[in-house]
Amino acid sequence: MYLCYMQATMDILELKSFLDEKVLQYNNPNFIESDPVQIPHLFTLKEDAEIVGFLAATIAWGNRKMIINNAKKMVTLMGSSPYDFVMTHKEHHLEPLENFVHRTFNGGDFATFIKALKHIYLNHNGLEGVFAAHQQNDSLQPAINQFKKVFFEIEHQNRTQKHVSDPLAGSAAKRINMYLRWMIRNDNAGVDLGLWKTISPAALSCPLDVHSGNVARKLGILLRKQNDARALAELDAQLRLMDATDPVKYDFALFGLGVFEGF
């Protein structure tokens, strides 16, 4: 067992019990009002929800209010009909996107993403289809790598590639793992949407960021100091010991402890 701050009083079963309680505390509809997951909840059509979810997750770094506001701007720029916009847009429809900016994600990146999404729906059976085609039983990280290759089969600027992380290149791929959690987990708790039925939640990886990483280290379930792909594999292994069928539910506990409780 890992050496940890709480080891003297908390074994793995006690830790699981503690984190299970925190999952129940944070994995409920109250979580949505301050989280970007609210963006895909605005839509009922699967394709609409998965498109805006992907875009919202892509810009999910920085201030959460700013993320949510800018994601809503993206929805407005797509005429509040994202799937229709992606599939039927002409070049001149992309011009209003030019002034969009969130941190380093700009209007040119946004336009490229629209074109890439159309390519995926036309030629690769949609977003779920790409990930399902390349999934492995115990990990979606190789599927993320393949998704990035497919996504950038269209003409694009090299700078735009940085907005889709690649775990096989060492990234923890926090934002895309968060997006996959939204799309795949379906526990009827009202937060994650569970729209994708062809991929098991058992294959998901935790969206590892500064909050979840720091809490995991304090709990002794993560030793590596960098938040990278190796740290993610280490954390995933520990979370699967507590629940192999739904390991990423513990993201709610780790994130909630870090953000809301200052753990």
For each predicted feature, which ranges?
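HhH-family (HhH-GPD) DNA N-glycosylase catalytic core used in base-excision repair
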Residues: Y2-F263
